[in-house]
Amino acid sequence: MLRKLTLSVSALLCALCLLAQDPTGGVRGTVVSRADRSAVAQASITLSQGSSVISRTTTDQDGNFLFPNLADGMYDLVIEAEEFVSTRVNVTVNDGYVKNMFSLSLTPSQVLAELDASNFAEFDMDDSGYSDNPTILFGQNDVYNSIAGYNFSTVRFRNRGYSAESQDVRLAGVKMNDALSGASPFSLWSGLNEATRTKDSFDGAEVADFGFGGYNGVTNIPVTASYVRKGWRGSVLTNSALYRLRLMMTYASGPLDNGWSYAFSASARLGGNDWIDGVYYRSFAYYASAEKKFNDVHKLSAAFMATPGQRGAQNASTQEVYDLVGDNMYNSNWGYQNGKMRNARVRKTHEPIALLRYDFTPSDDFKAGVTALFRFGKNGYTALDWHDAADPRPDYYRNLPSYFYMEESDYNRNNQFKADWAEDLWTRGYDQDLIHVNWTRLYNVNQNNLDANGRLRSKYVQEERRVDQRDFNLSGNFKWRADRNFTLTGGFDAKINRTENYKILADLLGGDYFLNIDNFAEREYAATAEKLQNDLHYYWDNGSAKSLSKGDKYGYDYYAHVRSADLWAKLDYSYGAFTASAAGTVGAVGFWREGLVRKGLFAGLDENGKEIYASDGTLLTSYDPLTGEAISSYGDSEHKNFLTYGAKGRLEYRIGGNMRVYGNVGYLTEAPTFNKSFLSPRTRNSLVNNLVPVKNFTADINWQLTQGNWNARVSAFYTTIKDQTDVMSYYDDLKNAFTNLALSGIDERHMGIELGFKVPTPVNNLYLQGALSYGEYIYTSNPRMTQTVDNSAELVTLDEIVPYWQSHPVFRKDASGNYVKDAEGNAIFDHNQKHYVPSTPQLAGSIGLAWNYNYWFIDFDFEYFANSYLDMNPVYRTDYAAAGPDNHESAAEIEYMASQEKFNPAHLLNINIGKSWYIQRKYQIGFSFNAKNVLNEKNIKTGGYEQTRLVDNTVSKERYYRFDSKYFYLNGANYMLNVYFRF
């Protein structure tokens, strides 16, 4: 009896103790796709109570999540995932139990999911002396990026006016931006849409969990097997703007019971397009990944991928050429050979990427990972090269009517007969070979050029300019949640890059050999054979220049060495609805050039440090006019080293769990890139004078709403970029020589607003959506210019101010357009006209309707673009270009020479239609059809550049004239149709 009483009292006391404690429970569940009930991995889930954010987590590979240790009460769950519409769920925790939500389904967001992301890769080409990349990746979880990232890319829109180099792009945590140029290399995985579909993106100056980033966002593509959508997927795509056919097949096992995951993908892109002759694709892609999860703590992943292939390039031309042929899509790079199109400029690439990643997760509060990545292979593009022969380009300025006759008599071009004759040849189409590359003529010239030994010495050849990288990277990151309020994140990046830059002889075009000598040097130094040599060591060993065969290296050959390392860390503080972050980074960058051949023009010193002489006694060693040191093309250049650093801060306040206000601020420095640090890396080791790090300041403030079907974001941003450098090489008509030009101290300011929204209308399943980007991106300094002659390093100008780069004066005119002058006869100043960062619309807007019902989607979007400007060259903004031969600057000369061309506004109409069907919840078949530029606008300039040449043989000898600018135009109406099948 006593024993029973004791047990009863003990049980009662235990129960009272339990009742006295605060009951704690939790929430668990599984996130699945509403379409096929498959698990949604890496979904982001935010738990809030009122205006306070309690916790955040992500789903595992099976779609599961858990929020433990929650006090009783009502909570909101916001679930977000790539390619799905965000959703909000209310949940109540009571009696200390863990509430199981079981399956929480997300509706697929299909509007953009099936479109071909390889559009981005097509901007990654410098084949025309013009380079451009988009700087917005698709961002389904941000309404502005989701709309602008697709709709604005048509006109080569740059996010906030920033260059593509400013965007931090990573694979499995490794920064992939090119070591030499900083460019985002989208082409390395173009065609692998399924394998690279999952992305984590952070905007502006925000610091990510996987990298510090810059001022233009950071994106990570996990790329390993467990991130590829489970199952089989095949698709067939055709489009009229890029290539005729794309075939793609992908398989992913998903996580298996034994901890392994596998994924494979392959694709082919083939054919030409409806608009630009000579542009074609013959590209393939492959991907394989395996992953082993040993337990909840250790995971090892490996991946291997590449996109081998080739594509024909487009070239820009002047408006005169486009008007002569009556087609703004004219491409001067191709011609007929034996009845078939042949493009002279073809990009050929095969750059495999191999990576190995280890993830370490000892607890829910700590995780870390490290990735080793190696990029290698070849990257080249072909071009025509010639010696002692006429320029083979069909749109060369001497082939055009304007070369013979101009209405302005001061041009000294007054031969109307020859102009009419040239125009007749272009417009009547008597001989198509005259307006395209005349391959037959090139072969005939070579096959009729016998040397004394009866061999055919080619005057025309096709070269391939190679940039072959060996790029090793090691990156790591960690995240530690110290308690409910503090989280510490950090990591490191290290890179060792060695890139070989050289040319090979791709095609002798019917000849037997081509001589490895410097064509420009032959014009000045023909009497000294050693001066002409591209490879003095070969000449010394053999007594003559090398007779080149197909596949031989020639011209130039050097290594670009780049080393970099950095550390970064971020501390996050969260309390209720308030969060704050502070982050910092420090790093070091070093680079140098290693010449692999000794060039006759810049022989340097011999192994004993002595001067080198030619056999006729001519001194081959030359000296830098600034440093007094011997200029060498062979061996190592000076090693340049830079210390970089940065700091960022962020504040965020959530209002009711559906709305947030946040801001970012950052200051960071960047080392100048290798490609913008050497005056002429093809020929010598000379560096740009006074290289300093680029200094960036950025700030933004944002308001965002995500509530049910209502999505909106408004942002304002301000960024300054200071102390940039740039280099170029061009033919200087005034010096009658090929020259090198370096600019330093280029400053920019970018400021503006962004708006994105998608809101429901009174009509069921119909949404109003739109995006707006309005900014002012201007130059804020007049840089300094140094110019040297390429063949001799002779100094033409040293650190001279380019006075009309930032702006130019505009003078007052009367109603008749005549200049108003003061009492002394001088034109009266009116205002300064700003000069703008080029090649992107500074006003871009989109408004449209989106309808979604029963797995149908239909979108109509109208876009408007304005305030886009032509890329400027510094020569036209100098005093001597504006002054002319008489060295007198008139108001008319300044305004003519220094002004920047503004493109006309443009508008577009785009339509997207798609439908998918699910069969037995196991299979999915669907299609998406996209029509762009439905109104068939063919006069929209998307970019271009000013030529760097001057008309100097004028009648008056008082002024210079510009050469015509060159442009790219938007394709007319085009479509894309994709049919896919999943199981």
Where are these regions (language model features)?
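Transmembrane beta-barrel wall of Gram-negative outer-membrane proteins
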Residues: 25-26, 238-271, 275-314, 346-365
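Short acidic/polar hinge/loop motifs at secondary-structure boundaries
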Residues: 136-137, 143-147, 174-205, 217, ...
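Outer-membrane beta-barrel signature, preferentially recognizing the C-terminal barrel domain
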Residues: 329-353, 357, 627-642, 646, ...
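Signature of Gram-negative outer-membrane beta-barrel scaffolds
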Residues: 461, 487-656, 681
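Gram-negative outer-membrane beta-barrel transporters
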Residues: 717-720, 741-876, 980
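C-terminal beta-signal and adjacent terminal beta-strands/loops
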Residues: 721-723, 866-889, 915-983
